[in-house]
């Protein structure tokens, strides 16, 4: 079973790796820059990030490899691809290569990197999990929730969207939500600003929304009908 780690614990762990990343690339927290998860994975963690077709239906977003093993995927036309993976391989489904999938691709890389971080830090806990599960950990689009996957998702979010970086982006975008209400409408300039923040950080709309809710910048779910929309289009 995975070790118990709170969100605060995972934030602390992420901070150490972000510090290493910033030091390696000469970035200052006084002028923070978004974290490129592929550079973090390769340069800081020593992982090998690859893009290959992993499935024909989009169900597998990525996987991380702990021990040498073979992997077979059957494509939509029936073609079988057989790959040999090595420890420290992180493989992302090639369907995520397009620019429109940047947020999902980045989060998947960070998620798989998080599995390696946790396995390295807590081998007695995660080593047992690996032996029970096999040699590979998958990130599935609609996978069953588990404690280990929650930790990997949370650590991934902390790596990509640390509080200091999000706060800097809030200031840069002049985001102002004094009552915490966000309208998911082009009539609300804050909605466009948050979309711009997501693009700059390299995450999806849903990822930045959840992060802003956790930071209590947004309260509750975004409201779809802006008052100006009612005036323009009626109820």
Predicted regions and their residues:
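Active-site hotspot residues in diverse enzymes, especially metal/ion-binding acidic/histidine motifs
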Residues: 1-235
């Amino acid at each position: 079973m995975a070790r118990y780690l709170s969100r605060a614990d995972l934030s602390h762990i992420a901070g150490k790796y972000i510090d290493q990343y910033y030091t390696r690339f000469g970035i200052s927290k006084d002028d923070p820059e978004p974290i490129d998860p592929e550079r973090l994975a390769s340069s800081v963690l020593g992982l090998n990030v690859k893009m290959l077709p992993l499935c024909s239906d989009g169900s597998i977003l990525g996987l991380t490899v702990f021990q040498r093993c073979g992997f077979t995927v059957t494509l939509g036309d029936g073609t079988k691809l057989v790959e040999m993976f090595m420890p420290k391989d992180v493989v992302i489904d090639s369907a995520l290569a397009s620019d429109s999938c940047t947020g999902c691709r980045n989060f998947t890389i960070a998620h798989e990197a998080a599995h390696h971080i946790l396995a390295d830090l807590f081998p007695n806990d995660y080593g047992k999990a690996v032996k029970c599960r096999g040699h590979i950990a998958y990130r599935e689009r609609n996978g069953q929730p588990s404690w280990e996957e929650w930790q990997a998702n949370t650590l991934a979010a902390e790596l990509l969207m640390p509080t200091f970086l999000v706060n800097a982006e809030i200031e840069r975008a002049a985001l102002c939500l004094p009552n915490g209400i966000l309208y998911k409408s082009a009539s609300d300039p804050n909605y466009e600003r948050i979309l711009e923040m997501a693009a700059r950080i390299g995450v999806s709309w849903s990822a930045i929304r959840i992060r802003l809710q956790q930071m209590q910048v947004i309260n509750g779910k975004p409201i779809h009908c802006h008052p100006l929309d009612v005036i323009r289009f009626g109820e």
